[in-house]
From Swiss-Prot:
Transmembrane segments: none annotated. Pathway: Steroid hormone biosynthesis; Steroid biosynthesis; glucocorticoid biosynthesis. Belongs to the cytochrome P450 family. Substrate binds at residue 202. It is found in: Endoplasmic reticulum membrane; Microsome membrane. SUPFAM superfamilies: Cytochrome P450. Its cofactor is heme. It comes from Felis catus (Cat). A cytochrome P450 monooxygenase involved in corticoid and androgen biosynthesis. Catalyzes 17-alpha hydroxylation of C21 steroids, which is common for both pathways. A second oxidative step, required only for androgen synthesis, involves an acyl-carbon cleavage. The 17-alpha hydroxy intermediates, as part of adrenal glucocorticoids biosynthesis pathway, are precursors of cortisol. PANTHER family: STEROID 17-ALPHA-HYDROXYLASE/17,20 LYASE, STEROID 17-ALPHA-HYDROXYLASE_17,20 LYASE. This is Steroid 17-alpha-hydroxylase/17,20 lyase. It catalyses: a C21-steroid + reduced [NADPH--hemoprotein reductase] + O2 = a 17alpha-hydroxy-C21-steroid + oxidized [NADPH--hemoprotein reductase] + H2O + H(+); progesterone + reduced [NADPH--hemoprotein reductase] + O2 = 17alpha-hydroxyprogesterone + oxidized [NADPH--hemoprotein reductase] + H2O + H(+); pregnenolone + reduced [NADPH--hemoprotein reductase] + O2 = 17alpha-hydroxypregnenolone + oxidized [NADPH--hemoprotein reductase] + H2O + H(+); 17alpha-hydroxyprogesterone + reduced [NADPH--hemoprotein reductase] + O2 = androst-4-ene-3,17-dione + acetate + oxidized [NADPH--hemoprotein reductase] + H2O + 2 H(+). CDD domains: CYP17A1. Keywords: Endoplasmic reticulum, Heme, Iron, Lipid metabolism, Lyase, Membrane, Metal-binding, Microsome, Monooxygenase, Oxidoreductase, Steroidogenesis.
Length: 508
């Protein structure tokens, strides 16, 4: 009995003790590390993780490492090193780590966002990009879809003229419908039960992922009861049940002659692989219902809360800077007026608005730390060796708040993106990657940029958004989960008198 116990202890120690690194190789500086727990006891336990990692950078340098349990993670906070990881050696660092909570969310790394590098990820990313190509022209043009939903949003807000409201739900509905039209060619109305399901599981998943989950560091803990994991499983179950119902209806009505949305593209790809026989058997397995559902879930997860969050952050900063709000309205009045609504063709004229959006994406990046990458082979970052299987995290917050790259980085200054004459947009620093870069970059970047620009241009043209009568300004600290969320806040919505008069004049 004792011999067996000693053997088991030695076996555990062997597998959990840090393995010897390549002799002679130079590795990044590391936080102190203990057997079994790694650097866990030496990492700050309070505050925002991205800020804590940024502070550690001042002690350990722009690239350093730490261990969580048995896994080594390299933290990168320099734009040149970040681009080496994401672009120059993008394929070498294109993997995703296995994490218990993310494996639940992605059904063991299916889909796009959390899938490891391989045939499945490549196929689904390619098909998602093919879907966006469907929306380049005609009535299905992406801009038309976005503007239709923004028009409905503005009508909704106009009915609440003079009231103080939280913009989250109206924005969530509009952005969700844009994604729904891309994915299913359908949309929801306010109060639709399905919309409530999406909202609930979306918020639940973000809250769950935002918690410190020890089970992600010590996977063996998943054998014990875990409320967080049970909640995550329930949210994913609700998501998949809703999406499966939509998928089944889509299969019934599918026509190979009418490919108009992402589900059509995915179903068509599976049918083509089924018809090609044994040669495409592997492709068919990678296009199972579970794979399709996870990919659609990824598009929702990446496309809804992110855009909604950026628009809300932009409004929040403008409430703190009312003079800038007026300047933005003046820019729109001078270049567009009130006889028509803003379009993407106005983007080159509305340079102050574009500079403001860029500054919001800098000072409050959608994801302060990018989704972790994983080295799929032995590689290097700068002068440092990185072993296969090492996790690599890009601290986007560090890139966007580096005092050597940005003047007064903690201050909201849209003018930093304008030349001295305030007549042209500029790139003041290369340390700016709001959507990542390389093969793992955000595939919805173009959609997100269009959405944020058009949402803000329409809102500025039609409404005065003001601080509520109680004088409560939005808190700008935020809550970092997978997405950097702003705390709920209210804004007083007032239809602009100039807009009202122009509409009355146009109707006579």
């Amino acid at each position: 009995m004792w011999e067996l116990l000693v053997f088991l202890l030695f076996a555990v120690a062997y597998f959990l003790w840090p393995k010897a690194k390549c002799p002679g190789a130079k590795y990044p500086k590391s936080l102190p590390s203990l057997p079994l727990v790694g650097s866990l006891l030496f990492l700050p336990r309070s505050g925002h993780p991205h800020k804590n990692f940024f502070k550690l950078q001042k002690k350990y340098g722009p690239i350093y490492s730490f261990r969580l349990g048995t896994k080594t993670t390299v933290m990168v906070g320099d734009h040149q090193l970040a681009k080496e990881v994401l672009v120059k050696k993008g394929k070498e660092f294109s993997g995703r780590p296995h994490v218990v909570t993310l494996d639940i969310l992605s059904d063991n790394q299916k889909g796009i966002a959390f899938a490891d590098h391989g045939a499945s990820w490549q196929m689904h990313r390619k098909l998602a990009l093919a879907t966006f190509a469907l929306f380049k022209d005609g009535d299905q043009r992406l801009e038309k879809i976005i503007c239709r939903e923004i028009s409905l949003l503005c009508d909704n807000l106009a009915m609440q003229d003079g009231q103080s409201i939280d913009l989250y739900l109206p924005l969530f509905l509009a952005v969700t419908n844009i994604i729904c039209l891309i994915c299913f060619n359908s949309s929801f109305k306010n109060g639709d039960p399905a919309l409530k399901i999406i909202q609930n599981y979306n918020e639940g998943i973000l809250k769950t992922l935002g918690k410190d989950n020890l089970v992600d560091i010590f996977p063996v803990l998943k054998i014990f009861p875990n409320k967080t994991l049970e909640k995550m499983k329930n949210y994913v179950k609700n998501r998949d049940e809703l999406l499966r119902e939509i998928l089944e209806k889509h299969k019934e009505n599918f026509s190979n002659d009418s490919i108009t949305n992402m589900l059509d593209v995915l179903i068509q790809a599976r049918m083509n692989s089924d018809n090609n026989g044994a040669a495409s058997d592997q492709d068919s397995k990678l296009l199972s219902d579970k794979h399709i559902l996870t990919t659609i879930g990824d598009i929702f997860g990446a496309g809804v809360e992110t855009t909604t969050s950026v628009v809300r952050w932009t409004v929040a900063f403008l409430l703190h800077h009312p003079q800038l709000y007026k300047k933005l309205q003046e820019e729109i009045d001078q270049n567009i007026g009130f006889s028509r609504t803003p379009t993407m063709s106005d983007r080159n004229q509305l340079i102050l608005l574009e500079a403001t959006i860029r500054e919001v994406l800098r000072i409050r990046p959608v994801a302060p730390t990018l989704i972790p990458h994983k080295a799929i082979m032995d590689s290097s970052i700068g002068e440092f060796a990185v072993d296969k299987g090492t996790n690599v995290i890009i601290n986007l917050w560090a890139l966007h708040h580096n005092e050597k790259e940005w003047y007064r980085p903690d201050q909201f200054m849209p003018e930093r993106f304008l030349d001295p004459t305030r007549s042209q947009l500029i790139s003041p620093s290369l340390s700016y990657l709001p959507f990542g870069a390389g093969p793992r970059s955000c595939l919805g970047e173009s959609l997100a940029r269009q959405e944020v620009f058009l949402f803000m241009a329409w809102l500025l043209q039609r409404f005065d958004l003001e601080v509520p009568d109680d004088g409560q300004l939005p808190h700008l600290e935020g809550n970092p989960t997978v997405v950097f969320l702003i705390a709920p806040f209210k804004v007083k919505v007032k239809v602009r008198q100039a807009w009202r008069e122009a509409q009355a004049e146009g109707s006579t």
